[in-house]
C-alpha cells in the first residue's frame, strides 16, 4: 500500500510524458511525427489507461479504509518563508482521479476516429494529453499555490482547445472570450489565495482551515477581511464552472472539437471549480455569508441555464446550457451544506454529459458529409430528425443520457438530483421551488433535443426538396403546428423557417399543399399529418465507426449503474449508502430528515419523477413526429387570448434564444464602455499628456526658425522686422490713449 501511495505522482506524469514528445516532435520533426500519428494516439491511450488503472488502485485503497496520504518536498526554504510541493491522496482525490481518467480515456479512444480526417491530428493529441495531465495535477495538489499553478494550466489547455481551429473567426473569438472571462475569476482567486496566506501564513488546506478557525474564535482577524478573501477565492470557481454572471464563455466554447467539449463539460475545466469549492469546503463552511452567496449563485445559475437551453437550435449549445444548469445544482448543494450530494451529482452528471456530448459528436460526424462542415448546418437540429433509424446505437445511448439528465429512475442522475431537490426544499422553500422548476425544464429541453434529432423524418431532405422547387411545410423548433408555403430560393431561408424564430408559437391550421407528397386523413375532427417523404435520391447519415461507438456503450453502462454508489440502503432502521461511507468525515449543519425505509424513499421521489415526466410529456406534445391539430377547437379559440398567449410565449422564446440578453448587456456596458473609456483615455493622452510637451517643442521650433530667419544676414529681413516693431508700437500707443484719454 505504501508503494502505491509513494508513486501516486506517476498518474499525472503519464499523460504528460505523451504530450511533451508529441509537442516537441511536431515543432522540430513535423513530417516524421505526422507519419506515425496513429502510433502516438495509441501511446497516448495506453498511458492514460495505465493512469486509470493506478487511479482505480488508489481509489480501492481509500474506500477500504486506507489512510489519507500526504507527501511533500521542499522547493524554497528560508527563515521566514518555505514553499512545499507534493500530492494529497484522500477520498475526494481518489474519486476525481477515477473520474478524470475514465472519461479522458473514453474521449481519447473516441477522438482517434473523430479527428482522423483532421490534418492537425497530432497537435490535438498533444493538447489533449496536456489537458488531462493538468487536471490530474490539480486534483492531487495538497495546497492552494500548487492548485493555482495547475488551475492556470487547465485554463491554458482549454483555451488552446476551444480555439483549436483558430483559422475560423468564431473559434478565435470564442477562445478570447473564454480567456478574458476567466481572467476576472482567476485574478480574484489569486488575490484570495494571497489574502489567506497573509492571514494564516500557509497554503496547505488543513492548516489553513484550522488556523482560520483559531483566529476567528479569538477575534484575531477581521471578519470583513476574511469574508472578502473568501469571496475573491470563490470568484475562481464562479468563472471556471460557468456560474452566473461569469457563465458567458461556456456556450461559445462549443467552437472546439466535440471530444473536447465532452472532456471540458464532464471531467476537467468546469469540474475544476466544483472540486475547488469542495476541497475548501471546511473554510467556506465557517463563513455563513459566503455559504449563502454560494447557494444563491448556484440556484440562479441552475434556473438561468435551464431557461436559456429551451430555444437553442445548435445541438452542442443546448448541451452547454444544460451543463451550466447542472453545475448550478452542484453549487447550490454545496451552498446548503450538502457536500456528499454535490459530489454525487458531479459524478453522475460527468458520465451522463460525456455520453451526450460524444453522442452529439457522432451525429455531427455523420451529418458533415451530407450538409457540409459548417457548424451552422452540421449542428443545426432543424436539419436533423429521424436519425435513430440510421444511427441506432448512437440514438439509444443518447436516449440513455437524456433519461438520466431528465431525472428518470433508475438512471444515474435521478439518484443525485432527487436528493438535491429534497435537501434544497428542506433548507429553503425558495431553493426548493427553483430546483423543482428547473428539473421540469431540464426534462423538457433534453427531450426536445432528443426528439428533434432522432425522431421523425430526416429534415435535410426537406431542404433538398425545396431547392428542387418542391413545396414543403416547415417543422418548427418549438413544435409549431403549422405549415407554410415556402417561396424562398435558398436553403438557409428554409432553415430559418424550420427554426421558426419570429412566429415560433403560432397555432395556425396546416395549409397542406396539393403538391406535397405526404399522406393525411381526417378522424373525429383531428387532422393527422404524416412527415413528408420524398421518393427521390437523397443521402442519409450512417452509424459511426466502432472506435466511436465503443466509448458510447461504455459510458452508457456507467450511466446505468454509477448511480448505485449513492442509492440508500436501509438496515435496522438506519440509512446507508456507499458514497456516505467514502465521505464519512463530512458533517451537516442541521439534522436533515432523510427517509427511513424504501417506501418512504419512493414516496419522496414521486414528485420529482412526476415533474420530470410532465416536462417530457410537454416536449412530446410539441415535438412528436406526427402532429395532431383540432381545427374546430382552434378556430373557436378566443382571439384575444391567442394574442396574449403568443406574446407571452414569444417573450419566453426571445429570452431563451438571446441568452437572457446578458451578452447584449455585456456588449453595451462592458465591451463598448471599456472601448469608449479607452478611446477617451487615448484622446486625452494624445492631446493633453502628449500635447503639452509636444506643443512646447513645436513652439520652440517655430520661434527658433523665426529667429534664424531674422538673424540670417539679409537686410530685407532686418527692415521688415524694424517696420513690424514700429507698427506694433504705434498700435499700442494709439489704443492705450484711446482707452485712457
From Swiss-Prot:
Designated name of the protein: NAD(P)H-quinone oxidoreductase subunit 5, chloroplastic
GO terms for cellular component: chloroplast thylakoid membrane
BP-aspect Gene Ontology terms: ATP synthesis coupled electron transport; electron transport coupled proton transport
Organism: Cryptomeria japonica
Family designation: Belongs to the complex I subunit 5 family.
Transmembrane segments: 9-29, 40-60, 89-109, 124-144, 147-167, 185-205, 218-238, 258-278, 286-306, 327-347, 354-374, 395-415, 427-447, 550-570, 601-621, 651-671, 687-707, 719-739
Function: NDH shuttles electrons from NAD(P)H:plastoquinone, via FMN and iron-sulfur (Fe-S) centers, to quinones in the photosynthetic chain and possibly in a chloroplast respiratory chain. The immediate electron acceptor for the enzyme in this species is believed to be plastoquinone. Couples the redox reaction to proton translocation, and thus conserves the redox energy in a proton gradient.
Protein localization: Plastid, Chloroplast thylakoid membrane
Quaternary structure (record): NDH is composed of at least 16 different subunits, 5 of which are encoded in the nucleus.
